[in-house]
């Protein structure tokens, strides 16, 4: 990722948040930059022309991928490095692996990241090796070098974290929070993984405050580490075709572009709070 002598927050737009006809157009990069984003995240590996078009506007670029076997970590890391990406967020495994298989995957991710000099952030995503908070905590204890992408809605909604005390569960996952170097931003409630949060006011949406608590802790942990790169906060509000955005009477619940800007506002507030606590 981009070298820096100071800690900083960089807000990236995940291109999967935009309609297909929009995010395949280089014109979208201008709108993204004008909205205040400093980079973009590609879902699939684009052509080099696309990468260069973003970079020509001063936008950072990162990518994503999936690793199903140890060898896949090295192939993906090399492809990401060759594409000029700053980092990759990765889905690893399917969540059905035993501990020995999980350990082999984790070791390969770490080795591939070091070999190709590109951060590989393992996502806290359903249907992956980090789908469960207990296993995630145990894994980072065994592999403290593992870097993690905080895709918190998968845990918050998928594991119904409010049931049994969300504060206790946030405390429990602290060892994972300390390893998080990337955030995929969407906010869910206990029943739906992606919901309209209005202007971000938590007075009537207490789940917003829960996400902000986690994000602030993630930023605090980042600020305690050596300043080697900026922190990537990637807005990732996905469409109804994959059952993320909700629809009512054939219309999406909210404007995902506008909601992404609310998430950016919350991220900056959380980062400032973390800086004040440092």
Residue ranges and their predicted role:
Residues 23, 78, 101-108, 133-134, ...:
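Charged helix-capping and loop-helix junction motifs
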Residues 13-15, 44-46, 67, 92-96, ...:
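Active-site-proximal loop/turn and secondary-structure-junction residues that shape catalytic pockets
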Residues 60-148, 157:
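Active-site acidic/histidine proton-transfer and metal-coordination neighborhood
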Residues 115-201:
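Acidic/histidine-rich catalytic cores of soluble enzymes
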Residues 168-171, 207-228:
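A short, acidic, amphipathic alpha-helical segment used as a generic capping/interface helix at domain edges
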